[in-house]
Amino acid sequence: MNKIEFAYYEKGNDILLMITGVGGSTNGYANKYERIARQAMDQWDMSVVVATTPSGSWMHAEQNMKEIMDFIHSKRLNKRFKVYALGNSIGANIILWHFNQFPEIEKILAINPVMTVNLHLFRLLASVDKSVNVVFGELDESCKFASMLPASKSVKVNILPKIDHNFTNSLDLFINLPNQYLFNQD
């Protein structure tokens, strides 16, 4: 298994956690994660952690989530804080499958989770009491499986028309998703 890489931006007490898709960098395509990080620091006074998702991570998702949260705790020491988690592609799966083990995770934005891998692990969403927004691009392969997510009053599924897995030609829309779905500021 490859090593998770981290980027850390220090600002406020609470944390925006972003977990990339497989092979993603801490900056992201066209610096999308870096741009969201700057937005989080400037608009929401948050610190930011970006964690990459190495190849094969879905097979070690629980271990990876623990490593990511250990990294966050090493930066926060004994402070109380909330985590607002954004996962993209398999990074969304990692969060959705294991967030319940970490009470400091307050809200979740899962962008285009891969619904063809370990579908049974999504069952825990049926009893979740945290705000979970799952966003699919209409043209993403996993969108056709969106109805297989368990029904829950806390889980909202949103389908964006004419958007593919990579948000091709829609980078600004991707960058605005935390505003809309984590912080409810259209």
Which sequence ranges carry the predicted segments?
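Conserved alpha/beta-hydrolase "acid-adjacent" motif
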Residues: 141-147
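Short beta-strand/loop motif that positions the catalytic acidic residue
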Residues: 128-129, 134-136
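Gly/Ala-rich beta-loop-alpha elbow adjacent to hydrolase catalytic centers
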Residues: 86-95
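Catalytic histidine-centered segment of alpha/beta-hydrolase-like enzymes
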Residues: 59, 163-175
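Alpha/beta-hydrolase active-site loop
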Residues: 32, 57-78, 97
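Short, surface-exposed "cap/lid" segments of acyl-processing enzymes
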Residues: 2-54
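Active-site nucleophile loop of the alpha/beta-hydrolase fold
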Residues: 109-118, 139
